[in-house]
Amino acid sequence: MFDKNVLKGKRILVTGGGSGLGKEMTRHFVKYGAEVYICGRRENVLKDAADEIMSEHGGKVNYFPLDIRDAMSIEENIENVFNEGPLDGLVNNAAGNFISRTKDLSPNGFNAIASIVFHGTFYITNAVGKRWLELGHKGSIVSILATWVWTGSPFVVPSAMSKSGINAMTKSLAVEWGPHGIRLNS
């Protein structure tokens, strides 16, 4: 369908890239020539994913453990990545969720999801975006949402609220950063 080198020379970061949707996106980015960075909380999962994908397709999959709730750690890791050269793409895929009746949610339960999905996505988007702005580098950001952004859903209020916030962030930054060649979609 695509030329096997359509992404050659592109550098892409996938959060939550060690499993599930993030791993599959990474697999296809590498298949089409991109150098990919994956991050997540479980280093052994990241290593296994990187090794598996490179054994299938060659290419280069770099990984680093990262708790996306930690803004300072994000800044340090993104700085390290950019020291090797600027990224061209960011996929905001890291997420967390659990099912709970809203009336039973504790503040800690709510914050556990909001810290990953809402805050973490903003922290990493801003860390990458501000470097692109400083360098005058064009880039693309894709943020993964869920259908309940539009439809609502019971028992997932922290995730629905957080994903809705990401949708608003995406639209707002598309207008703010678009004139600088930074494209955002969700």
Predicted regions, residues:
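Active-site loop-to-helix junction immediately N-terminal to the catalytic Tyr of the SDR YXXXK motif
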Residues: 2, 105, 152-160, 172
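Conserved glycine-rich cofactor-binding loop
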Residues: 18-20
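Conserved glycine-rich Rossmann-like NAD(P)H-binding loop of the short-chain dehydrogenase/reductase
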Residues: 34-48
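Substrate-binding pocket helix/loop in short-chain dehydrogenase/reductase
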Residues: 101-102, 106-114
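Active-site helix of classical SDR
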Residues: 125, 162, 170
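Alpha-helical segment proximal to the catalytic Tyr-Lys
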Residues: 130, 175-179
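Residue(s) in the substrate-gating loop at a strand-loop-helix junction
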Residues: 146
